[in-house]
């Protein structure tokens, strides 16, 4: 968790989970925020027409884990147990490579927020601006990143049994959802994008809970200033 505890706590920690992930979120005042080790930064980005940007990961985390692990028994176990959490194309590829039957027809998509890993000597906000440009083709001139607060997220992936850490920042853009769609070019990280209307974030999904939590953090930080 680094030294984020030195920043003032804004909200009580909250834990959300589904069949794939378990996420613990803690909101802090921004203050001095520096990355002391490799981690990822994500942006909870709201459009000018009150929608939040959702990214469709090019390869699911599960597919990437099976494809790159050198442990053959692990490959087989993960495929047999969790292959319904992959796209049809991913299952077809691994079914062929592992000589295992494909027993599902569910076209699962990993929904994530724009962002990525911090590079050496890169600030947290610069990392997010770079990632949004790379993934969504949106320049920094269209972005306003909230620097009053941040959310630390500890993510446990139930499928691949691994932990990840992220810093989430709230971002507003003066582009509409249609303009973002028109700018978007599929890339090696993100194959597509979609949006959820701000009026629909009370639906009980993992990503809507993340959105609601950071909105609450932004409102709390504004009321404290």
Curated annotation (Swiss-Prot):
Pfam families: NUDIX
Binding-site positions, Mn(2+): 135
UniProt entry keywords in alphabetical sequence: Hydrolase, Magnesium, Manganese, Metal-binding
List of catalytic residues: 131
Annotated EC: 3.1.3.-
GO molecular function: hydrolase activity; metal ion binding
Entry's induction text: Expressed in the late phase of the viral replicative cycle.
Ranges where the Nudix hydrolase domain occurs: 35-218
Cofactor(s) annotated in UniProt: Mg(2+); Mn(2+)
Residues given in the record as Mg(2+) binding sites: 122, 157
InterPro entries assigned: NUDIX_hydrolase-like_dom_sf (IPR015797), NUDIX_hydrolase_CS (IPR020084), NUDIX_hydrolase_dom (IPR000086), Vaccinia_D10_decapping (IPR003301)
Motif Nudix box, residue numbers: 116-137
Function as written in the Swiss-Prot or TrEMBL entry: Decapping enzyme required for the removal of the 5'-end m7GpppN cap tethered to viral and host mRNAs to allow their decay in cells. May therefore accelerate viral and cellular mRNA turnover to eliminate competing host mRNAs and allow stage-specific synthesis of viral proteins. Acceleration of the turnover of cellular transcripts may even promote the shutoff of host protein synthesis.
Family, per entry: Belongs to the Nudix hydrolase family.
Protein name: mRNA-decapping protein D10
């Amino acid at each position: 968790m680094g030294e984020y505890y030195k920043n003032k706590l804004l909200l009580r920690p909250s834990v959300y989970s589904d069949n794939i992930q378990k996420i613990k979120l803690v909101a802090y005042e921004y203050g001095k925020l520096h990355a002391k080790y490799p981690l990822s930064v994500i942006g909870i980005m709201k459009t000018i027409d009150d929608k939040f940007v959702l990214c469709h990961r090019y390869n699911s985390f599960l597919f990437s884990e099976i494809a790159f692990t050198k442990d053959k028994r692990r490959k087989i176990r993960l495929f047999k147990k969790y292959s319904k959490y992959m796209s049809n194309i991913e299952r077809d590829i691994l079914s062929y490579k592992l000589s295992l039957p494909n027993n599902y027809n569910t076209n699962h998509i990993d929904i994530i927020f724009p962002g990525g890993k911090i590079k050496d000597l890169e600030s947290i906000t610069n990392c997010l601006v770079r990632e949004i440009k790379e993934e969504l083709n949106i320049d920094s001139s269209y972005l306003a990143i909230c620097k009053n607060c941040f959310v630390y997220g500890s993510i446990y992936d139930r499928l691949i049994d691994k932990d990840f850490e992220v810093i989430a920042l709230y971002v507003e853009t003066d582009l509409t959802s249609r303009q973002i769609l028109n700018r978007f070019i599929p890339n090696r990280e993100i194959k597509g994008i979609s949006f959820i209307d701000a009026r629909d974030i009370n639906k009980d999904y993992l990503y809507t809970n993340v959105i609601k939590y950071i909105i609450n953090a932004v409102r709390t930080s504004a009321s404290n200033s």
